[in-house]
């Protein structure tokens, strides 16, 4: 088949499978709803064991210091469990040692149905694991050695991941208020989107619909990650991003045709269509926003990311501009 005829086929496939502007608008509306979740009121309890070191308590306290007006932070210092627990709290964190008073307080908080995480001070606690095992306590905790940077980083990641998983209804508000929650939440979004797109890509009866579904999922991922880092996405940016993203996920039909123009191994194409591309794009977005990237640079970031990946950009370029034009129409 002549080259021009093949490109005509590409154009017809693009028009058939690229999501409609209305679908992209719906994604934008969903992202706008998510953005509003950032303003939800947060009620956080912080219990500090008087036996814990100042270094450990300072490290954890500083994580929750914020100027965000919708956050209520209650800090209580304790020697025993004779403290008041606000049952309306969204979550609680205990900074403590391996003492019975910490365990008693944990049970008291759990009785109030308030999710609780314990940060044990490694400088004053001897053997936390055996301490908890003896009391048949299975729970969420980590050991912090406040003088070690790696230990502090691990604690932040574990605590941030815990908050994102436990405080599901308010996870975007937590990410907006406390930066250490942002990356774990963003990576969770990337992971879930990659899994969903992988499932879409391998279902046979979705062969005519998988392109727009995967594209819309990736656009939604982009919007959610941007929201996590306090960035606002508008419809025009979504359309522009769609033009870049669709060139990367066009595997089956389009690449079968373009592959006759510029040969590509089948395993490269299929690997990119689902898990690979979504992971690459998602991680690039997270790193970009973590470094303070602005929303205006997102489209250029996507272009560079896809060109530098194993997408085999040489095959994408002949149709990328046509795809982008179709999406904007």
Model-derived features: where do they sit?
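Charge-biased C-terminal accessory regions appended to nucleic-acid-, cytoskeletal NTPase
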Residues: 269-329
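N-terminal targeting leaders of membrane proteins
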Residues: 171-189
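Canonical P-loop GTPase G-domain recognition
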Residues: 56, 76-77, 117, 124-172
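Low-complexity, polar/amphipathic intrinsically disordered segments that mediate membrane, lipid-surface
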Residues: 1-5, 62, 66-67, 82-86, ...
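Membrane-inserting effector segments that mediate pore formation, membrane fusion
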Residues: 183-284
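Conserved G1/Walker A P-loop phosphate-binding module
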Residues: 3-78
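Conserved C-terminal guanine-recognition region of P-loop GTPase G domains, centered on the G4
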Residues: 34-38, 50, 57-71, 81-139
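Long, hydrophobic, amphipathic alpha-helical segments used as structural scaffolds
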Residues: 170, 233, 289-292
């Amino acid at each position: 088949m002549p080259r021009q005829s093949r490109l005509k086929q590409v154009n017809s496939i693009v028009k058939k499978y690229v999501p409609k502007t209305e679908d992209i608008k719906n994604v934008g509306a969903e992202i706008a709803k998510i953005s509003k979740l950032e303003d939800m009121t947060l009620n956080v309890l912080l219990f500090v064991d008087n036996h814990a070191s100042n270094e450990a308590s300072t490290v954890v306290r500083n994580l929750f210091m914020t100027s965000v007006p919708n956050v209520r932070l209650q800090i209580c210092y304790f020697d025993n469990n004779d403290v008041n627990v606000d049952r309306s709290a969204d979550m609680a964190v205990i900074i403590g040692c391996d003492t019975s008073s910490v365990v008693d307080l944990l049970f008291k908080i759990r009785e109030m149905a308030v999710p609780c995480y314990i940060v044990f001070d490694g400088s004053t606690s001897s053997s936390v694991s055996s301490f908890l095992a003896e009391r048949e306590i299975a729970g969420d905790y980590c050991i912090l050695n406040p003088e070690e940077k790696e230990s502090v980083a691990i604690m932040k990641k574990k605590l941030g991941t815990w908050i994102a998983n436990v405080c599901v209804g308010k996870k975007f508000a937590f990410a907006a208020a406390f930066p250490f929650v942002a990356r774990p939440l963003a990576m969770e979004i990337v992971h879930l989107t990659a899994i969903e797109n992988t499932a879409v890509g391998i279902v046979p009866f979705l062969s005519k619909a998988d392109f727009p579904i995967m594209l819309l999922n990736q656009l939604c991922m982009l919007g959610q990650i941007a929201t996590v880092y306090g960035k606002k996405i508008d419809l025009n940016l979504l359309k522009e991003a769609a033009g870049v993203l669709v060139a990367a996920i066009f595997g089956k039909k389009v690449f079968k045709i373009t592959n006759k123009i510029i040969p590509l191994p089948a395993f490269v194409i299929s690997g990119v269509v689902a898990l690979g591309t979504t992971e690459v794009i998602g991680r690039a977005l997270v790193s970009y926003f973590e470094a303070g990237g602005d929303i205006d640079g997102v489209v250029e970031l996507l272009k560079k990311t896809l060109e530098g990946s194993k997408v085999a950009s040489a095959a994408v370029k002949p149709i990328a501009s046509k795809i982008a034009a179709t999406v904007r129409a």
